[in-house]
Amino acid sequence: MIAESTCSSIFVAHPKGHQGGRALLCYQALTRIALEHCTTARGAVELIGQLAVDHGFYGNVGAALSGSAETLAIVDTQEAWVLHLMPDDTGSSAVWCAQQVPT
């Protein structure tokens, strides 16, 4: 299961083809890919983080700083994780961190 909450960031990125954007992936795409390809929460965290860094992450299109990042709760039957994801200062990658939640 993956749940999300939109939050603030110090950087804003735009999708490719929109306002000169260079980022390819939003949280909806990242979560869909993770749900399709991962069998564990840990694997989903690692995949989302790597894809965001490699291909760029953008928050809500047209959002100011207040909607440019996401926090994801990622849970399986064994582990729970919280992942925070935001664009980097170039608009073409991402900065992320994750913490396992004690169960």
Residue ranges of predicted features:
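N-terminal nucleophile
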Residues: M1-T103
